[in-house]
């Protein structure tokens, strides 16, 4: 696909619902007693994989546009699926299901696409095995023998919301309490939603304690816009001359707003308006104006708050004056692709001064950039980041696979080009 270019980006946009919250609303709604009504659901491929898996375990789920109704069967109400569960490209679905399925009274198996089969599951398998789980393999396909679990006291080796959530979900079924010690704060959508549903769960800064739970009570979930999807427009509006973009109804959970902090640190003109709380999640309208950006250093405890936004932050760095250093981001190597290597390889095609490091990259920005034939590696965030990059590059650019954006943002290109009209 040839990437069309726009001269300015002006207007208001509503990005699709938050992917993390959409996944969790379906999963926890399935385990709750009663009916969970979800509005603003992200109908991307990953979240639809979650729905498919729970339907195969006997959960009645209705989809009507962005509204999803989950008829929960209770914590012990899942049924043994007739076939292997297929999670597509979704690491969230795969890892969180491990936590739920480990404590069931039936056996299951899980696999995904070729990308998922290369992604490490050992980081989930290890703590679950410490709880008594019986899981065969550390890469998909995974074979899970349902068994009785016991609580553990576990220190997370890396900040990972997926691993943390898998342990929390297993803890709902375990004998005794489960305590998790995070090394850095990761996204806490699971904790917020479970607390709203009546789980016996407490959070004390970086320590989470979950006790076995008999019942979860269904709650309605209004899914805010996904800040990871909004990030592409925040960077576009900042780097493109004569631009002003407002992204409405975006979730600004403090564990997710690293992108805003970094862009402001780089000099971006960003304001938050209409800030309010919805079902425990903080929501706002975010406006960005064209800005003169400067390089910065991104690392340390902010990384878990923007891990998915690092490719688009790298784009901002290209058009910022001076050097930007991204470090402590080894986690990028085990995403849909090795995103450190992918960003460096594709940016090199454009003549960008970028160097790969063991835990990130160094970008010397503020120089002219030319277009290129880009490879997305089947990675939705690479496809969207490269589309933003191409806007300010001289000459033509192409994408080998634009459809992979559907994983998290099915209407990305429609929304993108509306801003240029």
Locate the predicted segments by residue.
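Structural preference for solvent-exposed beta-strand-turn elements
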Residues: 1-421
């Amino acid at each position: 696909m040839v990437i069309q270019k726009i001269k300015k980006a002006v207007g208001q946009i509503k990005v699709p619902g938050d992917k993390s919250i959409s996944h969790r609303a379906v999963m926890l709604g399935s385990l709750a007693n009663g009916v969970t009504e979800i509005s603003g659901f992200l109908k991307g491929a990953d979240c639809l994989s979650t729905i498919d898996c729970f339907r195969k375990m006997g959960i009645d789920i209705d989809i009507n546009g962005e509204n999803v109704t989950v008829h929960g069967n209770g914590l012990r109400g899942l049924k043994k699926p007739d076939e292997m569960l297929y999670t597509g490209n979704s690491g969230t679905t795969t890892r969180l299901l491990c936590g739920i399925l480990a404590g069931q009274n039936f056996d299951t198996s899980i696999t995904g696409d070729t990308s998922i089969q290369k992604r490490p599951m050992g980081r989930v398998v290890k703590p679950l095995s410490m709880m008594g789980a019986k899981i065969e393999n550390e890469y998909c396909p995974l074979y899970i023998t349902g068994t009785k679990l016991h609580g553990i006291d576990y220190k997370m080796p890396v900040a990972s919301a997926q691993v943390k959530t898998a342990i929390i979900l297993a803890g709902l079924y375990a004998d005794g309490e489960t305590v998790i010690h995070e090394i850095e704060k990761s996204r806490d959508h699971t904790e917020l939603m479970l607390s709203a549903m009546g789980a016996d769960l407490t959070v004390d800064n970086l320590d989470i304690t979950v006790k076995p739970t008999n019942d979860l009570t269904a709650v309605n979930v209004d899914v805010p816009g996904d800040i990871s999807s909004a990030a592409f427009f925040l960077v576009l509006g900042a780097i493109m001359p004569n631009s002003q973009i407002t992204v409405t109804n975006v979730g600004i959970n403090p564990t997710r707003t690293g992108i805003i902090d970094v862009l402001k640190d780089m000099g971006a003109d960003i304001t938050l308006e209409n800030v309010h709380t919805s079902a425990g999640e903080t929501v706002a309208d975010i406006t960005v104006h064209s800005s003169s950006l400067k390089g910065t250093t991104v690392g340390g405890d902010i990384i878990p708050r923007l891990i998915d936004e690092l490719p688009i932050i790298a784009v901002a760095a290209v058009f910022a004056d001076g050097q930007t250093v991204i470090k402590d981001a080894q986690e990028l190597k085990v995403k849909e692709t090795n995103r450190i290597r992918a960003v460096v390889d594709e940016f090199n095609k454009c003549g960008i001064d970028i160097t790969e490091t063991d835990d990130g990259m160094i970008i010397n920005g503020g120089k002219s950039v030319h277009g290129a034939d880009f490879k997305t590696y089947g990675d939705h965030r690479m496809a969207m980041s490269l589309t933003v990059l191409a806007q300010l590059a001289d000459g033509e650019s192409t994408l080998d696979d634009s459809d992979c954006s559907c994983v998290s943002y099915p209407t990305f290109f429609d929304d993108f080009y509306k801003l240029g009209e």
